[in-house]
Amino acid sequence: MNTMSHKFVLALDEGTTSARAILFDSDLNIVNIGQYEFPQHYPQPGYVEHDPEEIWEAQMLAVKKAISKIDAKQIVAIGITNQRETTVLWDAKSGKPVYNAIVWQDRRTSPITDWLKANYFKMIKDKTGLVPDPYFSASKIKWILDNVPNVREKAERGEIKFGTLDTYLIWRLTNGKAHVTDYSNASRTMLFNINKLECDREILELLKIPESILPEVKPSSEIYGYSEALGNLIPISGDAGDQQAALFGQVAFNVGEIKATYGTGSFILMNIGNNPIRSENLLTTIAWGLEKNKATYALEGSIFITGAAVQWFRDGLRAIDVSDEIEPLASNVEDNGGVYFVPAFVGLGAPYWDPYARGLIIGITRGTTKAHIARAILESMAYQTRDVIEVMQKESGISINSLKVDGGAAKDNLLMQFQADILGIKVIRPKVMETTSMGVAMLAGLGVGLWNSLEELRSIWKVDKEFIPSMSEEKRRALYSGWKEAVKRAMGWAKVVGGQV
């Protein structure tokens, strides 16, 4: 094709294990993809770090590959999406990181967040929508300020910058001209008041974090600065955390629209509109903001183990050689044969929040085969998704009529049909499964006027397949009741047998 007349949007997707760059055309078709892995660093048990320089190098290699077939002058916008919460502090003058990036999985700051949980839980949940946990950026920033020599002193002199990885990449791409983040990423720091849409001074003072190190918080779609890294100036005009970008990429623009991303674990986000809803069992987060001082909010539920259970079936039990074999194996049986699998390898996430739960296979008889267990593993993903969606409906009072899906397991037709059956609602799989990158490409294109409205984006978005529920209500109720019983037996198990959390 003659690409010279085409306009393209470049999405940078900075993940936990690799940096990707995906080039989209103006009809949101994928033109090319670049992907490079970068090393994980584990200096001590519970510590997980990345070298920001290695991330930058991997990201630039990915960009080079993605744009190799076009002229960079045809790129009208760049959007950035990222692993959320991961924290970098760097020297404002030299641009050099003062310490490795502390990754969202890192647990070293548990003593800090245990103290916050014991003394300030309600205040933090009310203001930020989050629960005190090492997962979020605030305690990671405090740890670096307290433990890396001279950093606190430099921070107090205004010589240190903080950012999640979107902020760091924008800083690098603009040669230090822009120190910004968007509402969605700011809402994952545990320093941002999601009601007032500003950094919270009370929490900053509590953790002794100087406000001067924080980036300016802007809408998710506007020009933040211009990239100087590709030979010509290109506007950087979209920014969103990965899960929020996926919600946008699923065109979930209306209240009650919901998406599930099936990865190693799963993330379920629901658009709840312009007012934050307080939730007992879920996180309240900012989905995006398309204009200043106005945000769209989401409820978020995270499931710790979904796709990782298939990896365990493959590597731990050696029951299959490759992950793709699980669907045909599970298809060999009509149903689960009464077998339930609760994948509580590291406890249970939303809505149970039980770190003492442990994995369980129950209902085994002499007639149970490998295929029944394979089916039970797939079904556990659907049951856990229903667990979260039921809480979302109950706590929001919003009726959910369909579920949009993406991620690796969404390609599995057997699982997606069962997901529709056990929920009793339609499940919709999009044509383009790279919803995270597509979401931030949409935001970037909106920011420069390549697309003019959410309606225009919705009209471009395409469905691959819809799964319509065909199970009777009686069977649905019986199967889900069995799942709830199995979960009850898995909960608290590590306490019973004295296992480690």
Swiss-Prot record:
**Record keywords, A-Z:** ATP-binding, Glycerol metabolism, Kinase, Nucleotide-binding, Transferase
Binding sites annotated in the UniProt record for glycerol: R84, E85, Y135, D242, Q243
Which SUPFAM superfamilies does the UniProt entry name for this protein?
Actin-like ATPase domain
Q: Which organism is it from?
A: Saccharolobus islandicus (strain L.S.2.15 / Lassen #1) (Sulfolobus islandicus)
The cellular component terms of Gene Ontology attached to this UniProt record, alphabetical and capped at eight, are:
cytosol
Q: In which pathway does it act?
A: Polyol metabolism; glycerol degradation via glycerol kinase pathway; sn-glycerol 3-phosphate from glycerol: step 1/1
Entry-linked NCBIfam families: glycerol_kin, PRK00047.1
Q: Which domain of life is it from?
A: Archaea
Residues that, per the record, bind sn-glycerol 3-phosphate = T16, R84, E85, Y135, D242
Q: What is this protein called?
A: Glycerol kinase
